[in-house]
């Protein structure tokens, strides 16, 4: 006969165990299946298109010119990894598959190497950030997370193999600017730990030079926007809400979107502050770890306060900085912990992990919410509209007949990966524009009224009979004194993703010629 108490003790023991067992592969398989489902149903938005377009539509010189001049506001590691896939002519979906591979590799490393209770590792894998934001939406962030976890797993060997450590830090620096503060903290901590050896041990000189020079290079790239870039010279006015929102979002995404947000948002904020306090308390005798977390948080808070207020994908790195620092911070010997009371090292760590676990449990509803949205609704209307344009070409040979697609909004780049060989004409540039080069002119064009777009196009082409207007919103009145504007297709009903990317395709019909049948 089963002893309930014994069964309960076994369940608790299994839940708190920090080892990796063969049975954990089942959870990894479930994680991979869910992420794969999300990737399959996801419609990429304009930001996801940028790395692919930069890799596809530039030669090698142009590619590195765009990266070094920071046009995409991300370092070039992710873009560089895309190059062979793009140049081999593989489909756009390859980018999402690659990101899914990064997610699965990061999940395996976390499950196998992270020194956390099993239940916490499971909850982390199925958090909103790991299950959706970074794994399904393809940006450079998942690559940065994978490198963070590789560094965490390697961290205990940093003194034995400093060159490999320097290579990993360099890759992290070039993965994304969002982790610059964390990488800088890791470099500073390494220097602090080896301060007495640096002058004597030449073996450290090369690795240190690699890390410091790459940090300086990435910092220079990040701050060196071309004057024609649409974000050049932009600064945020100080707003304390940018900081409080970032902390709340880091530990409880969508806290500001629910019915009881007036209660949940402050709870998420103060819960996040308490977690940060407890983590610092738990590391108070480990100065390198304090330096690493402090550097990352200081950098992120500076960015969110003065440069870019960020969104979930940015705020999540506060949460990830905490996870990373807890991972690499070794527990003191049992004898040293003996007799300690709150807020002692082990207790503070345990309480912080417990509160984090509570947030993760409460956040499971976010997974259901976003996956339900992905299944029933489009994240962006770009894929649907691109399919409609391809169908027009297939049925009516519009591009062979000399038709031109006019697009004024920068988010039109979201369609371009699906339309190889097709270029959009921009009324502000007066030419076929590379929509992945976000100039002030291109950004200003997005603010034009739809009638100004039509007017500029008419001035350039004269006859509009072979023009297709790609708008981000419907025309208020679909006619003027010369043309009736036939709505050929509308894409994006129910769009729920970033920027709510909807697209409307119009074909001008000269009034004197009557109205031919609809193309679609």
Segments from the language model and where they lie:
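Membrane-interface alpha helices of multi-pass inner-membrane proteins
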Residues: 33-35, 130-132, 149-151, 162-188, ...
